[in-house]
Amino acid sequence: MADVHELLDTWIANVKDEELLAELNTMKEQGDEDAITDAFFQDLAFGTAGLRGTIGAGTNRMNIYTVGRATQGFADYLNATFEHPTVAIARDSRNKGELFVKTTAAILAANGVTALVYPKISPVPTLSWAVRDLKCSGGICMTASHNPAPYNGYKAYGPDGCQITSEAADAISKAIAETDAFTGVKSMDFDEAVEQGLVKWIDDSCLERYYEAVLARGVTNLSAEEIAGAPLKLVYTPLNGTGLIPVTTVLERAGITDVTVVPEQKEPNGDFPTCPYPNPEIRQAMQKGIDLCEQVHPDLLLATDPDADRVGVAVKNGDDYLLLTGNEMGVLLLDYICKTRAARGEDLTKKVAVTTIVSSAMVDALAEEYGFELRRCLTGFKYIGDIITSLSDTGEVDRFIFGFEESYGYLAGDHVRDKDAVSTSLLICQMAQYYKLQGKNLADAMHELYEKYGYYHNKTISLSYPGAEGAAKMAGIMAGLRENPPAELAGSKIEAVVDYNTCVNGLPKANVIEFDLEGGNKGIVRPSGTEPKIKLYIFAKGADAAEADAVLDSIEESGRKLLA
């Protein structure tokens, strides 16, 4: 790659966007070496998750030039793979989303690829739905999921509505590498592309069919009379993202109408002013909702992230509100689905549930209890989507009952191939109604599962390594763990080291290392695929909560030192 200063000068000479040009000129005038290096030391990597980065000027930023270059590469791939390709496009509430959508659609149109565009902000699951419903060759969603406000991203999908395969990502990445951001991108005027029918708006009927599919996949055995006898009261926050209309629409049609929306987080706002990190995994993002719960006393709090593919839940637990973890909600939902289906007389031994290698071991206990086949895949919901697609290809998609990952992504149904907070919000409410009729809330239900199967506790630690130096340090840490793995962790002997860069259980190779400790506890280390972070997943089982938490804390302390 060229010298960062040469790249800066090239961008100053070629950039037409006034905002980006001003940022570039400021970098040069101030001589801020750290800023220049971080903006230009690498190209944003295009992988199975597409692109993701902070918004701004440079090759390592999300802007119309990096988005345009990626789109040209995607268009080249589509034209080489499909005859008369079409692409569905959506965006969440993030800043620059509309600009990136129009830039992308105009480039696709100039390359002979028909672009079908949602006219308003739309959740990730509705994009996956549109790809399948409209029989598109692919899809693109402008989103950075639950990253902080300075981020945006470019999520690419295949014709099955699942995030693109590794093979497709490699082919697109190669095409991108051969494209000059300033001279190699074909484009045309967006409005002209609309007039010529090369860009078309996705109408409301597509979204209506999505709602119908979600409602058809609800899971409840309760009668209307039973539901009316225990009406659910809900506080909901879309965290200034895309979830408000689809989530409340689906809940209302399912008869769940007592919904109070957090007013400060109701409207779309890419600055996320009330929660700089709009991630329903963390209490800070949920705090406005919890404060409102203290006033209206609902049965539960639901929060969807900006692109409404993840959902978090909080329930009253003593004097405070408990945030259920992704693993806890995953096992609660899976247990509820199994109970409900078994009560209908379904043979669960013919069913398949899917989770990841970093999800709770309690799922294995559920599989033993109910008899379903459990499949574990690599981290990333695309791998769960791939398994659903493979079942569909063999005419066995009805076997799939549930998939989840520990990072608050869930799917019960084959209508889409990505995590779906809209349909999961309905499922969570149906489950809450089931337990409410028994005089319980979801905290009570989770306590019963712990008492029955054991206290499987989990914790995820994220350590940040920003900038060019951080990327090198992350690579060095992972290399060091492979070359000189520790003999013990938290005073426990490491009985096995599993390197997923070699073929493990038929899974694709991945930059993941697992340390299996004596006593059945373990730690898993993997770099994030979307942020400059290394994640440490800790797993512990105890006779009670205190014992499990003590083990978690001990492993965390040792793990932080190991990754420092």
Regions found by a protein language model. Give the residues of each.
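An N-terminal, well-structured beta->alpha segment
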Residues: 3-104, 111, 193-194, 199-230, ...
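Phosphate-binding and adjacent anionic-ligand microenvironments
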Residues: 294, 298-300, 320, 340-526, ...
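Gly/Ser/Thr-enriched, mixed-charge loops and adjacent short helices
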Residues: 11-15, 19, 35-44, 152-285, ...
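N-terminal small/polar loop signature for handling phosphorylated ligands or for N-terminal nucleophile
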Residues: 88-151, 253-313
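Conserved phosphate/anionic-ligand binding catalytic regions in large, soluble enzymes, centered on
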Residues: 40-60, 144-147, 238-250, 306, ...
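Short glycine-rich or small-residue beta-strand-to-loop segments that form or flank ligand, phosphate
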Residues: 86-92, 233-236, 411, 539
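Active-site phosphate-binding/coordination module
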Residues: 126-184, 306, 317, 406
